[in-house]
Amino acid sequence: MPPEATASGDSGTGSGGGAALTAAESLTVKGRAPKTGYSRERFGSAWADTDSNSCDTRDDILKRDLKQVKFTDGDCKVSYGVLESDPYSGKEVVYKRGASLVDIDHLVALSDAWQKGAKYWDASKRIALANDPLNLLTVGASPNRSKGDGDTATWVPPKAYRCTYVAAQVAVKKKYGLWVTSAEKAAMVKVLSTCSKQALPTGGNPTNAPARFHAN
C-alpha cells in the first residue's frame, strides 16, 4: 500500500524505518548539478517489469493504489479503477485506461534525481529508481503536472498529505544516496518538524535492476 496521510504532529505511518525528520537531517547537501545529458531514456524503458511478475510497473502501481479495479485480458492490464482520495488534491478520480486523468508520479522526479547524483550511476541503478514502488504513487494528473520535476523546496501537496509526501521523498533519497540542495533540505526539515514522529517509509525493490534491462 502507498503511504497514508497523517495529521500534523501525530505518530505518522510507515514500516519501521525510524523518524523521517532524523533521516532528512542526515541527507548530504550539495549544489544541483547541470541537467546536461538527462533524458527519460537514461532510466530505461518506461515501466519495465523489474520485479519479474509479468506485469509492467505502471499496472502494478495502479493495482496497489486504486479501488474497484477491473482488468483487460487477465490480471495485469488495469482497465478501470477509482482513486478514492487523490493524495495531491483530496478528490476522487476515476481511472479509465487510455484517458489522462490519472498519473503515476515519481515522488523524486527522475530529472531531479539526475541532477543530484543519478547522472553518475550505472544504468541498473537508474532503472531500479524509475521502477521502485517506494518512489511511485498514483495521483490525479492535473496537480501532478503542476508539480513537474520540482523538489520539496519548490512544490509540496496540500497539508493533509504533506508530511507523508516529504517523508517518502526523504526515504527514496536516503535509500539511493541522492543528495539534496540546502533549500530542499531546509524545506524538508520545516515540514517534518510539524510531524516529528512521522515514520520513514521502507521497502520497495532492490537498488539494482536485473541485468536483462538496459538504458541508453
Regions found by a protein language model. Name each.
Residues 87-216:
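Domain-level detector of nuclease and nuclease-like folds
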